[in-house]
Amino acid sequence: PARGLLTFVPVFLLSIYGMLLAPPGAQAKRLRGYLVAVVALHWVLISFYEDWWGGHSFGPRYFSDMTPYFVYFLIPVVARARTRPALLVLFGLLTAASFFVHYQGAMRWASYAWNVEPVDLNRAPSRLWDWKDPPFLRSLRP
């Protein structure tokens, strides 16, 4: 949870749905296949990094280059949401959750200090998997 793409940008869950939606036209279908392949290849490549978590950072640092791809795949979802109120509400809730997480990282020092407190992340990378202490909730603790 400490570096997960979908933990830090929950609205990108809908991008996965957008990857499955069939775009109109043969060229768009080919483009979709290429873009999905780029995202998948990127994911596989960074998985082989020794410090796949990106060191002292906030969020999925190595996935930041993929943001335009995930936003592209939100386009058909947003288009479909105009006629499906439940999808529009889900989009709004996931977007709000995404903003909340990034607000914590941008405005709360405790979220960034998570990398070194209580122990340096690079010495104890097992902390990345601790659901009881995600960095974006650190500032909410008493």
Regions found by a protein language model. Name each.
Residues P1-L5, I46-S64, R108-W114:
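Membrane-interface catalytic loops of GT-C/OST-like multi-pass glycosylation enzymes that act
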Residues P1-P23, L121-P142:
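Membrane-lumen/periplasm interface segments of multi-pass, membrane-embedded glycan/lipid transferases
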Residues L6-K29, F70-V77, V89-A96:
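Hydrophobic, aromatic-rich transmembrane alpha-helices
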Residues M19, P23, S47-E50, A81, ...:
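Transmembrane helix-loop junctions and nearby membrane-interface residues
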Residues A28-A40, R80-M107:
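Signature aromatic-anchored transmembrane alpha helix within multi-pass, membrane-resident enzymes
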Residues R30-H42, E50, G54-P60, S64-T67, ...:
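Extended hydrophobic/aromatic segments used for targeting, binding, or gating
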Residues S57, L90-P142:
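Membrane-embedded, lumen/periplasm-facing catalytic core of multi-pass transferases
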